[in-house]
């Protein structure tokens, strides 16, 4: 095969769920996986409106059916589920044939596991009109065949895919796919956006922070996190004194958080002690303006010790001052004689031992 250009079909299919005028997309992801010795291939079909999964079919389910994955899909009539369940089962059967066919095209043995991925759908603008339609097929993670932007022709990735291309051209496959993309796909997307507008047209702004990670050779990694945002489109950049560090930055793909929002991070390696010269910038449509963040070091142990010592000294000074003030007040009240009590006439101080007196701290909550 030609050099593999891994399609991000599964990554997109795993993506889950502001108010947005557009564009919007309706996409379906089909995955068929052979598993020799473990039974028939598994077939999964997942549908997305923008970044929200709304339907799913899994051939491994106890009762394989097209099932809603979003609450707003409960408004769809029962016939929708019956019709699409049958379509999914037909696609499951076709995928088994396709897996066997590609084994033959690539002269592969039947002993290994192989995967076919298919993604198709449409994008519409804020006016509801079609912006583009697409269909892509991958085999074992590599491009196989794709519908071109004109929606009339196909691009084959290798010699094996050319066989499929010729068959599809003879069968008029592009014309049928174009009719669907320009018609039913756009119509259903409009309907889904209307039914699910509370979810699909919302915006959740990202919560961002920077973490600090030690490295050898007097280096550290600064990692800028953006969490809990929707929709998935976001930009994270690092700057050094105002200049972007695109080449030196590690950036991960946007990932689903599992709660209908997304997360992402970008990191740079910087010299130890120079962290404050680096800033992270977060751009998202849910933010009134971009965020700018720096690494904020926690208070040092020395600073904490000094603060505690100062508080102890101040506390001791306050207590000492209160005691001195109390004694001075008592002296004034007794005319400076040094005490409140005089010995009774005839008392013999030498005959009595002093009691074992202990200071009792008064409990302000006690009634005694």
UniProtKB/Swiss-Prot annotation:
Residues 204-295 are annotated as: Alpha-3. PROSITE patterns: IG_LIKE (PS50835), IG_MHC (PS00290). GO terms for cellular component: external side of plasma membrane; lumenal side of endoplasmic reticulum membrane; MHC class I protein complex; phagocytic vesicle membrane. Residues 296-305 are annotated as: Connecting peptide. It comes from the Eukaryota. Residues 112-203 are annotated as: Alpha-2. Residues 1-21 form the signal peptide. The modification Phosphoserine is found at residues 350, 353. The chain crosses the membrane at residues 306-329. InterPro entries: Ig-like_dom, Ig-like_dom_sf, Ig-like_fold, Ig/MHC_CS, Ig_C1-set, MHC_class-I_related, MHC_I-like_Ag-recog, MHC_I-like_Ag-recog_sf. Heterodimer of an alpha chain and a beta chain (beta-2-microglobulin). This is H-2 class I histocompatibility antigen, K-W28 alpha chain. It comes from Mus musculus.
